[in-house]
């Protein structure tokens, strides 16, 4: 599978899981993984799961507009940049967001080493 196909499959899996079973996202991170969420940093799978689980909405739906990827590093990793919009309820206005993942290979799969998320206002 080429890098673009891996990136698109990861993005589809990540946001489907976020929208339907957010606690299951913890399996995509490791102890050395880092999330920067709106400028706040969280280190390790447990801290990341805690942050994602504490978000102040029960429902969420992501619509993805773009997925771009590049190879990253000699170990076969990749950078994945995502832009799109999300809704936190059926009557809520969509919010634009950008998110970047650095994926690293581990045991025939990939895990999220770095994750940066920002809402885009304006």
From Swiss-Prot:
Q: Which UniProt keywords apply?
A: Cytoplasm, Protein transport, Transport
Entry annotated with the keyword Transmembrane helix:
no
Please describe what this protein does. Answer: Facilitates protein transport into the nucleus. Could be part of a multicomponent system of cytosolic factors that assemble at the pore complex during nuclear import.
Q: Where in the cell is it found?
A: Cytoplasm
Q: Where is the NTF2 domain?
A: 6-119
Q: Which domain of life is it from?
A: Eukaryota
| One term under GO cellular component | cytoplasm
Its GO biological process terms?
A: nucleocytoplasmic transport; protein transport
Q: What is this protein called?
A: Nuclear transport factor 2
Q: Where is the signal peptide?
A: none
Indicate where this protein is primarily found: cytoplasm
Which species is this record about? Oryza sativa subsp. japonica
**Which InterPro entries does this UniProt record tie to the protein?**
NTF2, NTF2-like_dom_sf, NTF2_dom, Nuclear_transport_factor_2_euk
């Amino acid at each position: 599978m080429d890098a673009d196909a891996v990136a698109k499959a990861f993005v589809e899996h990540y946001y489907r899981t976020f929208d339907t079973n957010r606690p299951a996202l913890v399996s995509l991170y490791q102890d050395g993984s880092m999330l920067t969420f709106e400028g706040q940093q969280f280190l390790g799978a447990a801290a990341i799961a805690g942050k994602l689980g504490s978000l102040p909405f029960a429902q969420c739906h992501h619509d993805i507009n773009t997925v771009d990827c590049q190879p990253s590093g000699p170990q076969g990793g990749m950078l994945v940049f995502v832009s799109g919009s999300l809704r936190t309820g059926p009557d809520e206005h969509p919010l634009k967001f950008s998110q970047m993942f650095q994926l690293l290979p581990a045991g025939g799969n990939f895990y999220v080493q770095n994750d940066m998320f920002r809402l885009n206002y304006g």
